[in-house]
């Protein structure tokens, strides 16, 4: 997602790269690029003028926002035939960190005199599945298949924080401010990383397990400050609140199966916000799911709904559904506090006061 939030770059197999309107994904265009790459990850430069996309066999391309042209980056030979899995620009855009299979990480920048690319020291041996940099500081987090979670400081030093043995698949850091990041593992663990901006090597990490959930985590992204969305396989979505340290269901797989079994067979590959409580999810089939608060839910139910609209790339609307939040009173109360109207919030506050008096 671009720094301005109005453009999304999508990528995947067969060298496919799409420019997508963040507010209306039906407005999209496939960019011209010939090749056989499978692109795995991409990131916008903080300046917003270009994006880097990386993939298998050391593939690395630059997408220019001025004319949406795609070109190979200089110095790509440094990566050899490594499968590149992750990329992130640091806070001020001075360096990009690129992670690959077998624990390899490079720091890279492109100067007038040519590429400046270096393999980093202190590496692990397992795949670097995700890299995420904080917006405010030149500090980045690294998550791996079994070497744990690492942090890169402004001097390009990699230190390992913990979480060894967990199959970490994704990490997300605040979009604007804050220094608390969230990482997830495929076996349903959530790590909260409190980044120390003055000495990143002593950053704190806490891990909680969510064994009762069905399926596996496959990634996450920030929805708004303090809130991230965790995608799961089979197709489902939960929210994790940093301030509360808890997770809540948004879209359950049973809802997806009931309304569209083909969608339920797909995988969530990414999401982005359009406001605090709304946004889009992109699926592995090239479709999009729009979610936003439902305005006309019967107040007597005491819970809110999320409107879901499914569209296909270049296609038409396939379906719409209302996925109600869980009937759990705890979750219903939390959802009401988050996105309820004023009357619902007042009613919820009264109910919570009554409950506290009984305890």
Where are these predicted regions, by residue range?
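Residue-level hotspots at or immediately adjacent to binding/recognition sites across diverse folds
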Residues: 1-355
């Amino acid at each position: 997602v671009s720094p301005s939030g109005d453009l999304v770059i999508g990528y995947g197999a067969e060298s496919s790269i799409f420019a997508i309107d963040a507010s209306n994904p039906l407005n999209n265009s496939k960019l011209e690029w010939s090749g056989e790459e499978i692109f795995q990850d991409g990131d916008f430069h903080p300046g917003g003028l270009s994006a880097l996309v990386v993939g298998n066999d050391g593939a690395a391309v630059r997408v220019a926002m001025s004319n949406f042209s795609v070109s190979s980056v200089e110095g790509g030979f440094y990566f050899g035939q490594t499968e590149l899995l992750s990329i992130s620009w640091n806070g001020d855009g001075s360096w990009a960190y690129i992670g690959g299979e077998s624990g390899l990480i490079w720091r890279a920048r492109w100067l007038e005199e040519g590429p400046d690319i270096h393999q980093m020291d202190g590496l692990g041996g397992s795949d670097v599945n995700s890299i995420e940099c904080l917006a405010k500081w030149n500090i980045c987090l690294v998550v791996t298949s079994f070497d744990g979670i690492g942090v890169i400081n402004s001097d390009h030093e990699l230190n390992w924080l913990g979480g060894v043995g967990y199959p970490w698949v994704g990490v997300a850091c605040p979009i604007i401010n804050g220094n608390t990041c969230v990482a997830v593992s495929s076996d349903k663990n959530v790590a909260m990383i409190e980044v120390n901006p003055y000495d990143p090597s002593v950053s704190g990490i806490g891990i909680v397990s969510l064994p009762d959930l069905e399926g596996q985590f496959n990634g996450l992204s920030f929805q708004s400050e303090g809130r991230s969305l965790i995608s799961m396989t089979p197709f489902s979505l939960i929210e994790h609140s940093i301030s509360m340290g808890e997770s809540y269901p948004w879209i359950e797989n049973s809802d997806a199966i009931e309304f569209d079994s083909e969608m339920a067979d797909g995988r969530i590959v990414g999401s982005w916000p359009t406001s605090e409580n709304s946004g889009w999810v992109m699926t592995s089939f090239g479709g999009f799911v729009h979610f936003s608060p439902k305005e006309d839910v019967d107040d007597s139910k005491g819970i809110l709904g999320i409107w879901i609209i499914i569209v296909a790339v270049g296609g038409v609307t396939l379906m719409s559904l209302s996925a109600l939040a869980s009937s759990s009173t705890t979750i219903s109360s939390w959802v009401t506090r988050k996105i309820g109207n004023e009357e619902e919030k007042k009613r919820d506050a009264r109910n919570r006061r009554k409950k506290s008096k009984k305890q």
